[in-house]
Amino acid sequence: MLYFLLHLYNRQFEIYVSSVGLVRELPSIKNQVSQSRIRVFPLLREPMRKKNRKGDWRMNAKKVIIDCDPGIDDVLALLLALRSPELDVLGITVVCGNVPTTQGAENALKVLALLERLDVPVYLGETKPLVRPYVDATDTHGADGLGESFLPNVTQVRPKECAIEFLAQTLSEQKGVSIIALGPLTNIARLIQDYPACLEGLGELVTMGGSYKSHGNCSPVAEYNYWCDPDAAKVVYEAFESYPTLRQKQIHMIGLDVTREIVLTPNLVEYMTCLSEEMGNFIRNITRFYFDFHWKQEGVIGCVINDPLAVAYCIDHSLCKGFSAYTTVETAGISLGQTVVDAHDFWKKEKNSHILTETDPYRFMTFFITHIFGADASDVRYVLRQIMVEDAGKRVWMPKDEEDYVEMLKGDVVK
């Protein structure tokens, strides 16, 4: 027996069924609804399938520490990281950024509690930038950093002190651990200044920050994370050019050039809620504020989610393309926080960074939904095509009449 969730949205019915196969059998449904079009969405076959966190999965997983300033997109990135069997999250270090450090730590614990992963430790890091005054981003993320959802704090465990010491000890004891930095680079700069020897064992540094050709999001030229603490960003980039232990490595810069391509829309949130009511409602509650901000500031229907792309890239480098170059960060004047990328090698300096400039939103969103919700990839791809997520620069074709609609049901049609 078929179960349908049917609702009216802008004079258009959307029908959710249990699998793509059933969609193929439903061309006659359109005749039952006059003066409207139908879009058909397959539901998850195994709602909210939990990853098995027992056994030897950690042996093959990439060991990472996530350094973040948990606002809305950081939390989505944490969801992705903690639901990905490819990653073994050794700990979460918190830095001041979107919200003050203590609030960011509370938000990280809320995610861990939601996923029943309070075994992952949370550490308090720096509470102010290296030099300049601290300016938060609560205008973007809400007073609590989670869209003013004001979820209750976690009481079972509390954040630990000394994020820098945790980073140093972990990198010294376990070779090949990577850092995914989703906030200002203050903690990472302090680590470099205080414990440079531990960096020899660093795996990768993937940072969400900066931009190459894209405009800024807090000034005409600067992205917030690097603008919040430009001195720290400069320390980190210069270290990868000058420190002997880091000169053979590069910073992977996931900047606004690629993250602006990743837009979470109301349709996608609705679909996620169908996959898991609990997780979907959590995402809906924390992103409402974000939706309003993006509409008022940039005319975007939905919200740009920067940080999850950095996590996805750390798992699968093929999700983004780019080039290697020397990069530095401006620390004064009207271009404060700007990443200066020497793409044409004018300065003949060591290429200290890998600048990502291209991504595929369709592939990313498939990755995001399948990992967080345990959804079947073929079903997710079918849904994304119907709700017009861009696929490598092409917009998915939507039917204009009955004949086109039947053709769509026969297969995935892209024109």
Task: List the model feature ranges, each with a label.
Residues 40-58:
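Short, Lys/Arg-enriched N-terminal segments with co-localized hydrophobic residues
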